[in-house]
Amino acid sequence: NNNSWNLKFSNATVNALLMLPMKASTSSPSESNMDFYSGVLLAVKDLSKEGISTDLSVYDVSGTNIPVTSDRLSASDFSIGPVNSDAVSKTLAIAPEGTYVISPLDHRTAGLAQSHSNMIQAPTSQGTQYRDLVKWLKSETHSGDKVLVISEKSAAKNASVTLMNEVISNASLSCARYSYNILEGRNAANAIAALMTKTGTNRVIINSESEAFVNDAVRNLDMLVYRKYDVVLYSPSKIRSFETIDIENLHNLKTRVSTSYFIDYESPEVRHFLMEYRALYNTEPTQFSFQGYDLAYFFIKMKSTYGKKWMENVARMGNTAMMQTDFLFRELGNGGYVNEGVRRIVYGPDYSIRIVKK
């Protein structure tokens, strides 16, 4: 078995690069990238306790200037970063095939994975999240239920809204559609009720990127819950960043969200990480600290475990749940690797927010 041979002999030092726009020498360093870096360092420290040694070189990348040569890249197993699309593209242009370039934060770099076999796209694409959400809705829909898609009337063209419409039609989801604008909001609740069932469950997608509109639609749906309609909301993850949404409404609507990032603060791993991070840095970790840790820990461990053809092995693995992200890497035809890991979370009527298993 090739894998076991690899496992025995591949425990050499992992040679990793980290390229981030930290702007360390400027008057306003990037806090998010510093947090990411702090998470990476903690992962390297934890891995050393497991007997895995890492040679980590860190570069502060400003703009699209790439501070490393092709030779330096060829001496490395992989590079985490750079972050923006142009810089990732320039790095791929000089990176030898045996050195992987991991895009850590920007889902817009996904297109580069189509044409570079050594590109690894870590953030899950919006399309993958939307497909998972619609698949989840379909799996929970029973006979007698109604599916309703609500959108904003005459809203400006938006790539995310268009993408969701494509995903819904590709999934052959039979649904009623209703669109309105906020000025008509007073009548919206009655119009939505007319499309609903009182006996089954009403499963709703609000297809809009506008916080004001989503907020209005959520309020209308919440009103219908009080009128004894059974309503479940299926939402893209952006709803979690809207500050004006009343969280209580999301719980009343038993909201389901498919997302690429969610931290379960009840988990023992997260609690341990929080204690370590506070002790080391005397501050609280941010989502960037978690992302830095998850990525560095996963890729260094995989390279150390599987040796030479490590990424081919990773692409055959099942889902790996890290602290903030799920990793499920798949190879693209002649291209590189994309992450299809999606976390499903449910807002319970008991005010819990929990991860649910697929």
Segments from the language model and where they lie:
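Extracytosolic ligand-binding ectodomains
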Residues: 1-358
